[in-house]
Amino acid sequence: MLPNQERKLRVLVVDDSSFMRMVIRSVLEKDPAIEVIAVAMDGVEGVEKALALRPDLITMDIEMPRLDGISALKEIMAKAPTRVLMVSTLTCEGAKATFDALDAGAIDYIPKNVTDSIDAQKAFKEELLRKVKGSGISILGRPLVSPSPRLVVPPRPVIIPRPAGQRYQYVGIGASTGGPVAVQEVLGRIPGNFPHGIVVAIHMPKAFTGPYAERLNTKCSLQVKEAKAGDIVQPGVVLVTPGGMHTALVRQGSTVAIRTIATAEYPQYIYIPSVDHMLTTFADACNGSLLGVILTGMGADGFKGMKHLKTKGGGTIVQDEATSTIYGMPRACIEGGVADTVLPLTQIGTEITKIAG
């Protein structure tokens, strides 16, 4: 086998739709760093080929005959653990199945939306390639694209010191790839009587954030709901920012409230909802009494927000490399000098409770 610096990322495509198999294969094979080693028409064939060929990565449909994608995923994870990206429909039912798959070991998902319009097809293809490449970095230990300039470490922000013993009144959490499971792990370790409000921004489509919040609400002691415009950030309540738009936090009298913003107003943000915008406006709205937390995810969304909240007197926690599904977002914060504390995932919820509780 070629060394990691030379060999391609080996991908298995599992989907019962011949059209989807063709689309996924054609998108991936256009990239010289990716090789589609095989396709499978259902879960049974997918498991067989996964065990025989040992791909680096699998794209897995959810609804398939003979053996569905989640059952196939569980069998693969039991016999030959492999990184799996689920390809799911943009529906409430599709969202719930996707979260079941993430609980079963899938690292991320790609919303299937290629039939509505040219724009939708383009968006699907771009996200597919981005997520496959992002996963490839952690598998092969190198970028699957020409190396881009490393994050230039800026001057450390001027920090406003907080009085000894003063606790933060709010918590803002940002995540992307691997985030749904990571956020659940963190919130699950925070007690239901936590005295401060929490806002979570995670890169998800509009159809997914509602079901995700409902799911978290059944698994955590805290009350969890999808945020709506005008919602007040309250103690013991977690607001999940809605997908398909950006969210700002604004001062409203003595409280902090949610304001939703169309993506067209901030075209500079690649990721939706923007973690940077949530954290930046949150820090301003609460005058820096904010604990910012960045979990697993590709890219650098959240770094600018964490840098800003540090200048306002806020505190920061960042997930470590060893427990991150994708180390991009945490790495940007650590290399950028805005991480007060770096912890494994299982310790972050407890640390939030200790610092802000």
From Swiss-Prot:
Protein localization: Cytoplasm
Record PROSITE patterns: CHEB (PS50122), RESPONSE_REGULATORY (PS50110)
SMART domains given in the database record: REC (SM00448)
Modified residues (4-aspartylphosphate): 61
Pfam families referenced in this protein's UniProt entry, alphabetically: CheB_methylest, Response_reg
GO CC annotation: cytoplasm
Alphabetical UniProt keywords: Chemotaxis, Cytoplasm, Hydrolase, Phosphoprotein
Keyword Hydrolase in record: yes
Residues of the active site: 176, 203, 301
Domain Response regulatory: 10-127
Family: Belongs to the CheB family.
Domain notes: Contains a C-terminal catalytic domain, and an N-terminal region which modulates catalytic activity.
Protein name, UniProt field: Protein-glutamate methylesterase/protein-glutamine glutaminase 5
Organism: Geobacter metallireducens (strain ATCC 53774 / DSM 7210 / GS-15)
